[in-house]
């Protein structure tokens, strides 16, 4: 049973539910991370994966941007490969590379060897959620997971990939093996997110980081049914749900279909697509989130202010065009070299508009 809090004053929860917020809500993907000196100090004592599985550390890292930036939502400090690790997959997160899989999944036997999540393995993550719920006050907590397609790509490629060639080859040449893999990863994703919901997160976001590598037809055939099952299973719990990918302009309509009507749903938009255009592509009842280019934050305050004002204006046009609501965010994660002071000023600016 969920221990979700009642947060009627939250601008973020109002916007994603299609209500009028008291101000434009803002938070940032990767707001907790390498751009913060306090995070870098903590990471000198803990590896990335170790930090994800130590409740007090994960709680502290999640809280750091809340204290510094006064954003309208916290997002749990974790990583999309955490449920894979909890299922016994031998992997590591390598600095400046990303997740690296010791034994990539290439055969039916490899797929069969993937185990369900060990509940004890994710207990520290859920303990972190409970610590955060107690500490966050009126700030909502977003839980998250990677979408099945993106997890599959890491497993099949063995790590990050430019072209996702092995992934697409399995998908197209061995569809039975592919769907068996996706079924297992969908089960892992559901279990991981259900645990977070029961521990008290106020919303969830599913990151399909590599979905933009697919054509719309391939996305609908090989990825969407599995992501849709994730959202359908979670829908009964009533938490707002966000679906995000990079380079997904042509997929936005399909991504919005993954969450059925009757649930507060959001589609994240990257900087390549105008929010007003995105509003015309998504299903009715869908709120939008995004979409300042993270690189703009490196260009000096005049450029940041100009671009942020334009994004907020575009978000309002999107709502006028039919989007259910709007949340300011970046079009992808905060870059490590970003000046935290710029983010502090950006939050203040967005709140003033």
Swiss-Prot record:
What are the record keywords, sorted?
Cytoplasm, Decarboxylase, Lyase, Porphyrin biosynthesis
Pathway named in the protein's UniProt entry: Porphyrin-containing compound metabolism; protoporphyrin-IX biosynthesis; coproporphyrinogen-III from 5-aminolevulinate: step 4/4
| EC id | 4.1.1.37
Spell out the reaction equation it catalyses: uroporphyrinogen III + 4 H(+) = coproporphyrinogen III + 4 CO2
Query: Site feature Transition state stabilizer: at which residues?
Result: 79
One molecular function GO term is:
uroporphyrinogen decarboxylase activity
GO BP, one annotated term: protoporphyrinogen IX biosynthetic process
Primary enzyme class? lyase
**What GO cellular component term, any one, is given?**
cytosol
Q: Which domain of life is it from?
A: Bacteria
Which positions in this protein are listed as binding substrate? Answer: 30-34, 79, 154, 209, 332
Location in the cell reads: Cytoplasm
CDD domains found in the cross-reference section: URO-D
Which Pfam family is an annotated match for this chain, by its short name? URO-D
| Parts forming coiled coils | none
Similarity comment: Belongs to the uroporphyrinogen decarboxylase family.
Task: Share what the entry says about its subunit structure, partners included.
Answer: Homodimer.
Chain's role: Catalyzes the decarboxylation of four acetate groups of uroporphyrinogen-III to yield coproporphyrinogen-III.
Output this protein's name. Answer: Uroporphyrinogen decarboxylase
Organism equals: Mycobacterium marinum (strain ATCC BAA-535 / M)
Q: What is the lineage of its organism?
A: Bacteria, Bacillati, Actinomycetota, Actinomycetes, Mycobacteriales
């Amino acid at each position: 049973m969920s221990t979700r809090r009642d947060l009627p004053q939250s601008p973020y929860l109002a916007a994603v539910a299609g209500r009028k917020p008291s101000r434009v809500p803002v938070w940032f993907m990767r707001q907790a991370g390498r751009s913060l000196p306090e995070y870098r100090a903590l990471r000198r004592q803990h590896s990335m994966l170790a930090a994800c599985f130590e409740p007090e550390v994960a709680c502290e890292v999640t809280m750091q941007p809340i204290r510094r930036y006064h954003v309208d939502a916290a997002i749990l400090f974790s990583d999309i490969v955490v449920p894979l690790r909890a299922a016994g997959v031998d992997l590591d997160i390598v600095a400046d590379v990303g997740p690296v899989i010791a034994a990539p999944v290439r055969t039916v036997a490899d797929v069969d060897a993937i185990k369900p999540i060990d509940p004890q393995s994710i207990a520290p993550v859920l303990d972190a959620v409970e610590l955060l719920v107690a500490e966050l006050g009126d700030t909502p907590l977003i839980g998250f997971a990677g979408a099945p397609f993106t997890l599959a790509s890491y497993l099949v490629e063995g790590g990050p990939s430019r072209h996702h060639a092995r992934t697409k080859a399995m998908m197209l040449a061995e569809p039975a093996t592919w769907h068996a893999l996706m079924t297992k990863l969908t089960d892992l994703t559901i279990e991981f997110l259900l645990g977070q919901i029961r521990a008290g997160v106020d919303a969830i976001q599913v990151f399909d980081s590599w979905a933009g590598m697919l054509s719309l037809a391939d996305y609908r055939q090989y990825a969407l049914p599995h992501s849709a099952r994730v959202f359908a299973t979670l829908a009964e719990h009533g938490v707002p749900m966000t679906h995000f990918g990079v380079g997904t302009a042509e997929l936005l309509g399909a991504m919005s279909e993954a969450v059925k009507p009757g649930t507060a749903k959001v589609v994240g938009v990257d900087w390549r697509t105008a929010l007003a255009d995105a509003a015309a592509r998504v299903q009715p009842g869908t709120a939008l989130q995004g979409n300042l280019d993270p690189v703009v934050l490196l260009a000096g305050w005049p450029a940041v202010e100009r671009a942020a004002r334009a994004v907020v204006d575009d978000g309002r046009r999107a709502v006028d065009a039919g989007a259910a609501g709007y949340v300011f965010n970046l079009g992808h994660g905060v870059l490590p070299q970003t000046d935290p002071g710029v983010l502090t000023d950006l939050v203040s600016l967005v709140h003033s508009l």
